[in-house]
């Protein structure tokens, strides 16, 4: 944990790094601990006042490793938020992660999702979807969303 950070974002971002692009943009402006579930061996979230969960969308939901981390490692009552990227927008993309945090009685402070470059399955044959995303506007909107989380936490 960083010496002053009160917020952590637990994430998984693999194929094109779409989600990580958003998180790195945020971390250039604000002190936030980014925890990559694909590299962390033990995750202790007990020292954070707010925890974010971030992922690309895989088969309509957050990556299983992020959902499992929320179930196993999230302290009860800690406010949470979600950030995600998707190839195509569908309903209920945050349902699995929301269900995981609800077991810990955690208030959900909001979510931000945007398009991300996607070459999964048949999309690869046509060169992928959303080639230029996340773009500058997506990054800016992610930062504005994060600023609402900070204001919520401070207020």
Locate each region found by the language model.
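N-terminal glycine-/serine-/threonine-rich phosphate-binding loop
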Residues: 38
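FMN-binding flavodoxin-like domain, especially the glycine-rich phosphate-binding loop
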Residues: 2-10, 14, 28-35, 47-155
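Short amphipathic alpha-helix with an adjacent loop that forms part of the alpha/beta core around
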Residues: 41-47
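A conserved segment at the C-terminal end of the G1
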Residues: 23-27
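Short N-terminal binding/cap micro-motifs at the start of the first secondary-structure element
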Residues: 16-21
